Amino acid sequence: MKFAVVFACMVAAVAAQVRYENEFYKKNPYRYSTYRPFVSVTTPTPFLPIPISSVAPVRVVPKVSEGYGAETVKFGNEINPDGSYTYFYETNNGIAAQEQGVPRNLGGNPPAVPVVAQGSFSWTSPEGVPISVNYVADENGYQPTGNAIPTSPPVPEQIARALAYIAKNIPLKK
């Protein structure tokens, strides 16, 4: 009984609390009771384009290759259960590629079995020169060779003699 009386008193106290609202508080300060949509009093004027004086014609560069219209002439793709594969393709605009890959077991725990790939690709440059690149990709990385790969210039004779002299006459520090 005492519990019911105490509970009823608490409910009455909570219900009797007055909410604090200061005089500056408004529930929605942006609400307008006399809302009217915007009405334009002016009528829009139509836009008339201004003619531009003619300019000098721009020279159009001819397209080098019509690669978007290339058709495949030859195509082959073979994947074997042991992980080896072979593929090749050739298009009618002179692009060709071929590659063979074979898994190589390098041992280890767990065993490392990377695929060693060997192949080539070729195309015709905008100047009409055929370009060919042969490559090997194995545990030593990607190793391309071909006429499109730049080569370093030869070492000048004076520097080669200086390096030979240093290697022969100056002992290495241990």
From Swiss-Prot:
Signal peptide: 1-16
Assigned GO CC terms: chitin-based extracellular matrix
Record GO terms (molecular function): structural constituent of chitin-based larval cuticle
Keyword Signal: yes
Keywords: Cuticle, Signal
Domain of life of the organism encoding this protein: Eukaryota
Keyword Ribosomal protein on entry: no
Start and end residues of each Chitin-binding type R&R domain: 82-153
Coiled-coil residues: none
Purpose of the protein: Component of the cuticle of the larva of Bombyx mori.
Protein name as annotated: Larval cuticle protein LCP-22
Organism: Bombyx mori
Name of the gene this protein is made from: LCP22
